[in-house]
Amino acid sequence: MATTINPPRDPNTLSNYNNWLSTHITANFDILFDQKKLVGNVIHKLKSITNAESTDIVLDTSHVDVTDVKVDGKPSVWELLPPVKPYGTALKIKLDQGVKMDEIVHVDISVKTTEKCTALQWLTPAQTSNKKHPYMFSQCQAIHARSIFPCQDTPDVKSTIDFNITSPLPVIASGLLVRDASGAPQTGGKNLYQFHQKVPIPSYLFALASGDISEAAIGPRSVVATSPDKLRECQWELEADTENFINAIEKIVYPYVWGEYNVLILPPSFPYGGMENPIFTFATPSIISKDRENVDVIAHELAHSWSGNLVTNASWEHFWLNEGWTVYLERRILAAVHGEAYRHFSAIIGWKALSDSVDHFGHDHEFTRLITDLKGKDPDDAFSSIPYEKGFNFLFHLENLVGKQKFDQFIPHYFTKFKGKSLDSYEFKATILDFFKSDAEASKLLNELDWDTWFYAPGLPPKPKFDTSLVDVVYDLAKKWQSIPESSFKPQPSDIKDLTGNQIVVFLEQVLLFERPLAPELSKLMGEVYGLAKSANIEVANLYFRVGLNAGDESVFEPTADLLGKIGRMKFVRPLYRNLQKVNRPLAIETFEKNKDFYHPICRAMVEKDLFGKKDA
């Protein structure tokens, strides 16, 4: 019989998922706040995808304590192989004999997390908003699920999941709550919470949170969950837009398949803007700006319900298939709700983020390519706005190339063809070429496209012609500031009276681009006249502080350090530390040392690299 060869596409896993596929996971965990660990067991239902040729099952682990392994109910021989940085330690489970193609084995692993777990953050009551109870939450993307339990930690494998979680505090997970069974009292003052995820998902979408959490409706199929003292303001921020966003994207792709779309507003140390955990988006409290200006994050995470969660990149080398598509769909939602000019306005903000990332890495750096080479590398190190914005610009280019009307027909086709599957960039290319093969005009344009340059060239792509109608007014205002002291311009509060928060963001980004930074006294004047230093909108405040740091305005040094102790979102934290260390490195280091235990482990590691260079994990 011929040997079965299933080449693995993901270089960032140690698992032999080319021999076995995890099709269902049962996760039974007890949340132990006093010990800061999860204790329990996971059961993998694994399907053989060879003809009895594999007698080992290899799973990813990282800093987990495995205490027992059973295969089909019987004790098994197993070992932890030597660690392979940065991928952890492979768990090798021996089988008595190979298993025929498509036959199933059940692997039951008893496991505890350890203090080196990179996926979980444990907060003391003091780190929460009402300071009453401890809190824990997970962040598994990209390769951190393996630090909670042994798994095939690759986006190229999808499983359904049953969660059985006991905790003394309410629990949220990336599944639908079994309402009649959940909250059932257990011994020792704990309750059992059960969730089912019936749509197969990759390991990085496994999510748990537990703490003092209350819920309020923000739409007919949506709730917001957060600390009781913040519930009303979070509800107000999100209730106007959430259902409108869902209705808009359902018209662009197809109906939402996950049942509920809910949002968990996390404590401020959450390292990302949002994480698209299915059913419950995990989001930063920095979007609660009391002006509904930052709910674009919700449009983005909602769009992931199609791109990323249903149709998934096969490896992190093709991350643009998750994020580029999601930014594209997010901006289509914004266009449907606010008008086409707003889509272009958002894309202009995105182009600035893309330029910043390319400048940060260097214009010929590997990580500025659309398809990256991550063999032997940590996907977290490659994380930036490049897959988001270069990916968006590629899809926007394709839309303009074939025409929006035609591209609109391709969107549901693509998301139907790969629904429940993972794919790479080459399958994407083959799919769009095949879809348009009967359209001579579109087919010619797509075949003549320089795909290799888009896929592999580092640096910036060609800049599209954006509609600048919403940015021209702020470009003009920035030019007036640049003209001081040569001009007679006198700043007034009325300069920004009619601007949205996002327009003020673009204004400040323009000021950051000045070849000659503002004089310190002008930076200070800007903050005073426009009230920027006191803005409740962190998108605005953090950029104003960066303007001040660039100017060497000492009046922003302490407010910057103060903000760095209140928010853990890397979008703000990393640039602020980079700017602060240029003008006052001792303050930057002192601020980091003071707050490093407040930050999520992922954020802490990235800031350490920014401030001190490479450090061994």
UniProtKB/Swiss-Prot annotation:
Superkingdom per UniProt: Eukaryota
SUPFAM superfamilies reported for this sequence: ARM repeat, Leukotriene A4 hydrolase N-terminal domain, Metalloproteases ('zincins'), catalytic domain
Residues where a peptide binds: Q139, C140, Q141, P271, Y272, G273, G274, M275, E276
GO biological process per UniProt: cytoplasm to vacuole targeting by the NVT pathway; lipid metabolic process; peptide catabolic process; protein catabolic process; proteolysis
Cofactor descriptive note: Binds 1 zinc ion per subunit.
Coiled-coil portions: none
Entries under InterPro entries matching the protein: Aminopeptidase_N-like_N, Aminopeptidase_N-like_N_sf, ARM-type_fold, LTA4H, LTA4H_cat, M1_LTA-4_hydro/amino_C_sf, M1_LTA4H, Peptidase_M1
Major location category of this protein: cytoplasm
Catalysed reactions, semicolon-separated: an epoxide + H2O = an ethanediol
Active site (catalytic residues): E301, Y388
Segment forming the signal sequence: none
Enzyme class: hydrolase
Residues reported to bind Zn(2+): H300, H304, E323
Record localization: Cytoplasm; Nucleus
Single Gene Ontology MF annotation: epoxide hydrolase activity
Family listed: Belongs to the peptidase M1 family.
Protein name: Leucine aminopeptidase 2
Source organism of the structure: Aspergillus terreus (strain NIH 2624 / FGSC A1156)
